[in-house]
Regions:
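Proteolytic maturation boundary segments
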Residues: 1-2, 155-234
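Short Ser/Thr-interspersed hydrophobic loop/turn segments at strand-loop and sheet-helix junctions
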Residues: 39
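M16 family metallopeptidases and their MPP-like homologs
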Residues: 8-18, 31, 44-155, 168-176, ...
């Protein structure tokens, strides 16, 4: 999508699974590790901390009665667009194919449990949680059993769920930019997906030390429409 701006905007993703999928909790853990856990997540480390491509990168699953979606997104300077796509896509490919680190998984579980009280920080949050339990016909002990179900998930469970439900070779990319080289983009994605080719990622030394601030949004979202931070409805 052509758009005249100093910032380029990138989203890549594909359809995913339903809310009642047995892998859902493992996928929520995986997402927290990949891009849903702030500065501790893989995408933030690769795109912001190491290279300064963006102020923020995130990933997300949506789950409902019908098939939801998996996506990752970020914004960057126009002249860093192709390098950033190479890094983000390669990080996703590696996440799918490399083993899950057991210590990182346990830290992610602990973080999810610590953030659980945020789901009940207001009457509206409590009402939403109870409504979700009723709508999806979950057991009355669903919330009480949540920590035990979370603790029972192993690195292999997460790895199997990732390989079943995340497909770097089947992504749809939406790129808002005033200068996109589609042939170069196709070449980058093909190289990332080829296990026989070892690519060198853009090194932090190649990146300017200062990132220009993003352009202000034309209209701020109202408090009623603002999205809340993690965790989503459990």
């Amino acid at each position: 999508i052509l758009f005249n701006s100093t910032q380029a905007h990138v989203t890549m993703g594909h359809l995913s699974t339903t809310r009642d999928d047995p892998d859902r909790l493992a996928l929520e853990l995986a997402n927290r590790m990949l891009g849903g856990g702030g500065f501790s997540s893989i995408l933030m480390k690769e795109l912001r901390v190491k290279r300064g491509y963006t102020y923020g990168a995130n990933s997300a699953f949506t789950f409902s009665q019908a098939a939801g979606s998996f996506s990752l997104s970020y914004s960057t300077q126009q002249d860093q667009l192709m390098d950033s796509i190479q890094v983000a896509h390669k990080a996703l490919v590696d996440f799918v194919h490399q083993p899950i680190d057991a210590q990182q998984l346990e830290e992610t579980k602990a973080g999810m449990l610590r953030s659980l009280p945020n789901s009940y920080s207001s009457n509206a949050n409590i009402n939403a949680q109870l409504g979700s339990i009723g709508f999806y016909q979950q057991d009355a002990n669903y919330l009480a059993d949540y920590p035990k179900r979370l603790a029972a998930i192993t690195p292999l469970d997460v790895q199997n769920a990732i390989r079943k439900h995340i497909h770097p070779e089947s992504l749809t990319l939406v790129i808002v930019s005033n200068a996109l080289d589609k042939e170069q983009l196709r070449h980058i994605l093909e190289l990332n997906l080829d296990p026989n080719i070892k690519q060198s990622m853009p090194h932090p030394d190649q990146i300017p030390a200062i990132i220009e601030p993003p352009e202000p949004m034309p209209e701020a979202a109202s408090p009623d429409s603002a999205q809340t931070d993690e965790p989503a409805l459990i």
